[in-house]
Amino acid sequence: MQSRYILLVAVATLVSTQETSGATLSMSSSSPLNEHESIRINHRFLRTHTEDHAVEEEERAPWDFKKFSANLADLGKLKLPDLAKLKQSLPDWDKIAGYGKATGTAAKLASAKSFDERLAIINGVKDIDEMNALFLMTKPLLKNVLPDYDDTTSLEALLRMIKSSDLDDDMKALALIAFQRYEGSLKAGTSKLDVNP
């Protein structure tokens, strides 16, 4: 179905391009025979083609107060939407903001040169939504490094997996600190994360 729309848009673009180029060529090749045949100079042409777009008085519908008040009464009978359902249908802006912050934090982590810089960046994350978004971003990488990892892995099991992995010591320590912070964010359940590594 979408390929038909794409084809339709491509054909419409091609046709409009050909029509425009043809119109440009035909306009450039046609020139008025004398100055009176030009539209700008031919005042009679302009006078004869003026149109009145105003609505005639008898074409307007008469204003009816009874009909207007009946419509207002009908509006008063309308049922208002349930605010709880409306709130559930709206996006969670805190989570969206958390993803934005997590993207910035991931960029900082990628550009950090030393272990201390990375540790300071991870310790600087105080928002639970940001920590959760960071974890979701790095989850595929974590599964590549630790194939036995899944969502039910405890901190002790993860500690054993990290120790037995072939990561260097700085990366092992950083991974443990980050996972402790993530686990603390799940336990905290508040908007701010004050768990020390």
Curated annotation (Swiss-Prot):
Domain of life: Eukaryota
Main localization (coarse): secreted
Keyword Cytoplasm: no
Annotated GO CC locations: extracellular region; host cell cytoplasm
Subcellular location: Secreted; Host cytoplasm
Keyword Signal among record annotations: yes
Keywords: Host cytoplasm, Secreted, Signal
Motif RxLR-dEER in this chain: 44-60
Signal peptide segment: 1-22
Upregulation: Expression is induced during host plant infection.
Family: Belongs to the RxLR effector family.
Function: Effector that is involved in host plant infection. Triggers cell death strongly in Nicotiana benthamiana leaves.
Domain comment as written in the entry: The RxLR-dEER motif acts to carry the protein into the host cell cytoplasm through binding to cell surface phosphatidylinositol-3-phosphate.
The protein's name in its UniProt record: RxLR effector protein PITG_08174
